[in-house]
């Protein structure tokens, strides 16, 4: 087969034959889209320190030549392609004419966001049947993971329906076999880990590993005696004193009786309210074999609910309960999980399973990111355009049909790029949350990250502008005369609502009032409205005529102008929420006045203003905001990206899903080791993996201010941004089992957190982790299996120890299988120490497996085709230069 290379910088190509016939029928387009084999390879990173080179191979297996010049191929990139040619010199916009690759006759264009296109010029040379060609082009920064290349590229031709290129639906990214591919720069210290390296990271020297009784660890356990057991396999009666829902939680899982009076012959479980307990979420649990009873008390129904969850955890180990007394209460009032359903949508069922797990592990806040640039996900009565248009991503030649494809969503609405919760579905979510004792916090991101709302309201404007101008402009979100140019971190040029027009606040008032009504109808009152506030482009609004009319006394640079307008916007939104009796929350940069300090909190009338402190990449110098905001009176939610962003990979491996702008990887151990009460103690490595210390970063109180008002640390939260979450399985994989480590730290303060000596603290933390990992592997993962959660199964470690191959996993108790041919799998001892072997870990229920890795006993440090990095080592912060999300 003849191969012709289209090279960006090389002016050599073979003319195979010029065919100028167009793609004229849908059959032609379908045939090419179904049979054009596309493969993407990273050639190298750190080209000139700022670029990576990409090779795209096209292999035409269609019966028709890919020729003519009336077609386009759309693809996705998190970074600007050919930035020196497509990006303006000031970086504020992309050139509308794109860039034609020299001597290739393909034009590259930035459409918007991460959507790009390539199209032939009139000089394009066709790609005949059964021919293969390659093009090479550059893109900004780096690509070190397969998920850096979203799937579902698609083709269009004039007047025809767009069609996904079938070969890009699945695995179309080549292997990463060189450090030039998986390192961002030469200074990058991260490599994928071999099974041998992983084995030594999993390995523990602790000879006294013990399972934790309950996760999260209770505050106090006394009178524990494993020789005194209470058998609950027979007649058991629950006496619940009006705590019907809490009693039902037990009977849903076990065939126990519910009675108004105690049984005289069997075992009794007593549930009751005890007002003497200090914490509203605190509880006591007593297992008394001699009295043949279990007693659970709480100050509130919520406290009893958590006591029941602890009992269910004990019962999962069998019918014999050890004698013990538990006195427990949470470390923080706010123990949250954030879910971005805008970038990629997840169903109500997925959220309900998530809440089941949150309840099991005593997490109590579900922060739902319902609107962003890529999608609007909640029905609002009277604003049908928000869901008719803003909830859909598709390819359309007409305005007002849908949002443009993003993040691999493809040309139609069949993928996770489209979807929304109806009013009834949202009420159902709220009702389920109430049952799980979880507060739902809705977020509508403004003033930035609002493209979905803007596009929807512009469609509404066009619909009514010729018949009812008042109705047309009522909810409009932009100033049509604003000529400001900007490009956001996510490459959008039109995503900021205008803070200087009254219709913006009419829109927000409408959304807040409708959300509040839904919460009230569901019996789940709205308490906190999250307005977003993050990542507003620096030059948004600088040329807005409407903002000029407000007569602000602007001074300084464009960032100062933006901050003044953000301040105005934030006050207006706070006033709206205050009139509805709500508290307000936002991302920390939404309140940022500059120099790490927030806007004056006295400007807000709300009882509480919550700030999510996320931006703690140590070298960036913004970790100080968390304590500065708390000292200024804000209620701070520790949301730090280096430890609590679950959209980041578990390991520094090209095979692992996720973004990596804040840290190359975040495994369960890293989240487990987070110290929210001692933020600067978490300082570990530079953006490229070199060790750093607190002393090196915290050279002054300006860089690392002290915390003077610790009571203003409201709690902590895990986060799943969904740029790479394309399925339900992706969702569970990224959240679990990291959520368990989050719950442990949010509920329980470990003794090692108070230890000043770093060596002693590390030793104590490792022992605590060993016990936690033992419990997760031998108990908790099976519980997750039982409720249908497909957590990540970690790949195994392996080591040739003096001729004996030893295997382990990060969570002890999971079975490991081996194979000589990657087809027939066995368990047991590996006898052959001379040949390469395939390895995989099984889930606790035995139904699923980890990624397959290869191990060469002869070298014991061989690199694998699917390498991994995991726990015990604190993987760390990585500069992705404000890529996609915080």
Predicted regions and their residues:
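Short beta-strand elements of extracellular/lumenal beta-sandwich folds
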Residues: 38-65
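Intrinsically disordered, low-complexity Pro/Gly/Ser/Thr-rich segments with frequent PxxP/GP/PP motifs
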Residues: 89-144
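Acidic, contiguous N-terminal accessory segments
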Residues: 149-330, 584-596, 605, 788-789, ...
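Feature activates predominantly on carbohydrate-active enzymes
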Residues: 288-507, 512-530, 721
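Active-site neighborhood of glycoside hydrolase catalytic domains
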Residues: 488, 492-608, 616-621
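Flexible, acidic glycine-rich loops studded with aromatic residues
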Residues: 583-803
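Short, compositionally stereotyped local motifs that mark structural "simplifiers"
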Residues: 761-860
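C-terminal GPI-anchoring signal of eukaryotic secretory precursors
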Residues: 856-872
């Amino acid at each position: 087969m003849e191969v012709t290379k289209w090279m960006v910088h090389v002016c050599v190509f073979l003319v195979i034959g010029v065919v100028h016939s167009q793609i004229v029928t849908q059959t032609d387009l379908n045939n090419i889209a179904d049979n054009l084999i596309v493969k993407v390879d990273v050639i190298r990173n750190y080209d000139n320190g700022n670029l990576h080179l990409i090779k795209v191979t096209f292999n035409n297996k269609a019966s028709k030549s890919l020729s003519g010049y009336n077609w386009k191929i759309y693809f996705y990139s998190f970074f600007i392609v050919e930035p020196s040619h497509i990006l303006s010199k000031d970086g504020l916009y992309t050139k509308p004419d794109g860039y034609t690759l020299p001597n290739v006759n393909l034009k590259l264009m930035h459409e918007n966001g991460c959507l790009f296109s390539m199209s032939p010029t009139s000089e394009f040379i066709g790609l005949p049947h059964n021919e293969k060609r390659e093009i090479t082009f550059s893109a900004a920064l780096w690509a070190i993971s397969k998920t850096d290349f979203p799937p579902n590229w698609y083709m269009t031709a004039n007047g025809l329906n767009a069609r996904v290129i079938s070969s890009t639906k699945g695995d179309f990214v080549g292997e990463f076999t060189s450090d030039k591919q998986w390192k961002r720069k030469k200074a990058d210290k991260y490599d994928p880990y071999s099974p041998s390296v992983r084995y030594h990271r999993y390995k523990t020297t602790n000879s006294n590993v013990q399972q934790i009784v309950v996760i999260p660890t209770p505050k106090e356990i006394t009178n524990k005696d494993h020789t005194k057991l209470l058998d609950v396999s027979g007649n058991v009666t629950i006496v619940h004193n009006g705590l019907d829902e809490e009693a039902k939680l037990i009977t849903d899982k076990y065939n126990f009786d519910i009675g108004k009076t105690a049984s005289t012959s069997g075992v009794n479980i007593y549930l009751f309210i005890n007002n003497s307990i200090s914490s509203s979420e605190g509880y006591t649990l007593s297992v008394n074999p001699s009295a043949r009873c279990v007693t659970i008390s709480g100050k509130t129904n919520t406290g009893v609910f958590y006591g029941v969850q602890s009992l269910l955890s004990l019962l999962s180990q069998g019918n014999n309960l050890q004698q013990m007394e538990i006195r427990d209460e949470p470390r923080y009032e706010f123990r949250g999980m954030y879910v971005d359903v805008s970038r990629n949508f997840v169903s109500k069922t997925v959220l309900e399973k998530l809440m089941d797990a949150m309840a099991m592990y005593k997490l109590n806040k579900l922060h739902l990111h319902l609107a962003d640039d890529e999608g609007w996900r909640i029905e609002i009565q009277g604003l049908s355009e928000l869901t008719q248009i803003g909830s859909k991503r598709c390819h359309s030649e007409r305005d007002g049909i849908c949002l443009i494809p993003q993040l691999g969503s493809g040309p139609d609405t069949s993928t996770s790029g489209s979807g929304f919760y109806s009013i009834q579905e949202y009420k159902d979510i709220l009702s389920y949350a109430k049952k799980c004792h979880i507060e739902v916090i809705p977020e509508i991101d403004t003033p930035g990250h609002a493209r979905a709302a803007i596009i929807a309201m512009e469609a509404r404007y066009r619909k009514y502008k010729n018949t009812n101008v008042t109705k047309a402009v009522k909810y409009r979100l932009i100033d049509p005369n604003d000529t400001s140019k900007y490009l956001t971190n996510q490459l959008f040029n039109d995503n900021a609502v205008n803070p200087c027009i009254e219709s913006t606040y009419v829109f927000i008032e409408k959304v807040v009032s409708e959300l509040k009504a839904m919460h009230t109808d569901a019996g789940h009152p709205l308490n906190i409205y999250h307005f977003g506030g993050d990542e507003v482009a620096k030059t948004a609004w600088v040329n807005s005529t409407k903002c000029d009319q407000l007569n602000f006394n602007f001074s300084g640079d464009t960032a100062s102008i933006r901050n003044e307008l953000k301040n105005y916007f934030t006050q207006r939104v706070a006033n709206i929420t205050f009139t509805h009796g709500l508290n307000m929350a936002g991302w920390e940069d939404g309140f940022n006045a500059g120099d790490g300090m927030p806007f004056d909190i006295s400007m807000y009338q709300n009882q509480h203003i919550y700030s999510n402190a996320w931006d703690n990449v140590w070298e960036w110098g913004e970790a100080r905001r968390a304590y500065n905001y708390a000292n200024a009176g804000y209620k701070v939610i520790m949301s730090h990206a280096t430890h609590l962003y679950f959209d980041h990979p578990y390991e520094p491996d090209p095979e692992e899903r996720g973004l990596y702008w804040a840290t190359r990887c975040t495994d369960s151990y890293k989240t487990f080791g987070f110290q929210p009460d001692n933020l600067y103690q978490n300082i570990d490595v530079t953006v490229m993996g070199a060790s750093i210390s607190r002393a090196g970063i915290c050279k002054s109180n300006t860089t690392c201010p002290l915390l003077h008002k610790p009571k203003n640390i409201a709690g902590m939260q895990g986060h799943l941004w969904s740029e790479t979450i394309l399925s339900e399985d992706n969702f569970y994989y990224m959240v679990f089992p990291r959520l368990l480590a989050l719950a442990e730290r949010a509920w329980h303060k470990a003794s090692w957190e108070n230890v000043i000596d770093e060596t002693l603290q590390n030793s104590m933390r490792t022992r605590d982790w060993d016990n936690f990992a033992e419990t997760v592997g031998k108990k908790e993962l099976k519980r997750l299996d039982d409720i249908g959660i497909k957590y990540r199964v970690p790949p195994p470690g392996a080591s040739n120890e003096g001729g004996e191959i030893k295997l382990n996993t990060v969570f002890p108790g999971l079975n490991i299988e081996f194979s000589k041919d990657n087809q027939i799998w066995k368990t047991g001892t590996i006898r052959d120490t001379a040949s390469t072997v395939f390895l995989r870990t099984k889930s606790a229920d035995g139904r699923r497996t980890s990624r397959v890795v290869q191990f060469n006993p002869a070298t014991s440090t061989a690199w694998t085709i699917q390498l991994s990095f995991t726990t015990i080592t604190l993987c760390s912060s990585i500069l992705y230069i404000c890529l996609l999300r915080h």
